[in-house]
UniProtKB/Swiss-Prot annotation:
One of its GO terms (cellular component) is cytoplasm. S-adenosyl-L-methionine binds at L76, G108, F127, S128, K129, M130, T131, L132. Keywords: Cytoplasm, Methyltransferase, rRNA processing, S-adenosyl-L-methionine, Transferase. This is Ribosomal RNA large subunit methyltransferase H. The gene is rlmH.
Length: 159
């Protein structure tokens, strides 16, 4: 399985970079995983609704440029479906079973994802109803993907 994590914004925090590197190393035994980091759109603090839409649309174009037609796209969004680790593992296993060798998880910038990215997505996933920093979501997502592979193979780790 080829997994892409497509995210908006440059990761600056060393501790997040270290955690991501660790999970990418662990995941290399199970799948080819790449993190695609796209630049965020510079925007002032107090944006109007129209300006927010423009920012999301520009970031959305960058995201869509990285997704091929044969990729199963999972958008990370607060309004997405919440799953347990076991349910998530089953979802990934089903994708592999039914020939979806390319999977892309999409993490938007601080304003979220454009409507075009949501439309292109095959499903939407939420890790919480709480708002989480999009930089932190990369690490949380990679940990859950790793956990899913361990669950699916019956290997110790998941508790």
């Amino acid at each position: 399985m080829n997994i892409s994590i497509i995210s908006i914004g440059k990761l600056k925090e060393k501790y997040l970079k270290q955690g991501i590197a660790e999970y990418l190393k662990r995941l290399s035994a199970y799948a080819k995983v790449e993190v695609i980091e796209l630049p965020d759109e510079k925007a002032p603090e107090n944006l109007s609704e129209a300006e927010m839409l423009i920012v999301k649309e520009k970031e959305g174009i960058r995201i869509l440029d990285k997704i091929s037609d044969d990729t199963h796209v999972i958008a990370l969004a607060i309004e997405g479906k919440q799953k347990s680790s076991e349910e998530f593992a089953v979802s990934l296993d089903r994708l592999a079973t039914y020939g979806k060798s390319k999977v892309a998880f999409v993490i938007g910038g601080s304003l979220g994802l454009s409507s075009e990215v949501i439309k292109r997505s095959n499903e939407s996933l939420s890790f919480s109803k709480m708002t989480l920093p999009h930089q932190l979501m990369r690490l949380v997502l990679l940990e859950q993907v790793y956990r899913a592979f361990r669950i699916n193979r019956g290997e110790p780790y998941h508790k």
